[in-house]
Design a protein with these regions (language model features):
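Active-site loop-helix segments enriched in His/Asp/Glu that coordinate
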Residues: 86-94, 116-172
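Hydrophobic "anchor" residues on beta-strands that sit immediately upstream
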Residues: 2, 72-74, 143
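Short coil/turn connectors at secondary-structure junctions
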Residues: 1, 58-60, 66, 139-142, ...
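Divalent metal-coordination and catalytic microenvironments
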Residues: 8, 38, 43, 67, ...
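Metal-associated gating/positioning segment near the N- to mid-region
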Residues: 60, 65-127
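Short, acidic Gly/Pro/Ser/Thr-rich loop/turn segments
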Residues: 12-13, 82, 151
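N-terminal metal-binding scaffold of metallo-dependent hydrolase/deaminase domains
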Residues: 1-56
């Protein structure tokens, strides 16, 4: 199914140079197109341009961006995806006003996470992390930076880094 997004205030990520990789200072160059439209076909971008040059397109769903910005995907530059178990209860506790110290007294916090990570195999950490990666990809994340930090020992930090390498090797 085709989707036409029209009236885009700023279409971000336009690069017609054909570069496959951007590094160093070139990362500061972000191509943008003002007052734009974008046509997709399935999960592929088919065409784009300025509203002044929007051709007549039939048989597609139309979405009016109403002047909003459109990014090719979400870039999450700070994640700790490699950890064992779940920290959802800690998140709820924080929302409900508990302090970090109170959460730690209840068995949560970084020390609890470090203990669980230490006791979990690399294969299991990879499996859990890939579930998280697949979930964020399904929600529109196209680029993610994965940080270590839950290991607290050299051995466990290296374990996290090996899992991160596996994720990098097996993810889109």
């Amino acid at each position: 199914m085709s989707l036409l997004v029209k009236n885009i205030g700023t279409l971000v990520g336009i690069d017609e140079s054909g570069r496959l990789r951007v590094e160093g200072k070139a990362m500061a160059e972000i191509g943008m197109l003002e007052n734009a439209w974008l046509l997709t076909d399935g999960d592929r971008i088919k065409d784009y341009g300025t509203m002044e040059r929007l051709p007549h397109i039939e048989n597609c769903e139309v979405l009016d961006a109403k002047g909003g910005w459109l990014f090719p995907s979400f870039c999450d530059s700070h994640t700790h995806i490699v950890y064992a178990g779940s920290r959802e209860q800690e998140f709820l506790d924080k929302i409900n006003g508990l302090t970090y110290e109170e959460i730690a007294k209840r068995g949560g916090g970084i020390l609890n996470s470090a203990d669980r990570l230490h006791d979990t195999s690399e294969d299991e950490l990879y499996r859990q992390a890939m579930e998280r990666v697949d979930e964020i990809i399904s929600m529109g994340t196209g680029l993610v930076e994965i940080k270590s930090g839950y290991g607290l020992t050299l051995e466990d930090e290296l374990k996290i880094l090996r899992v991160i390498r596996r994720i990098k090797e097996t993810s889109p």
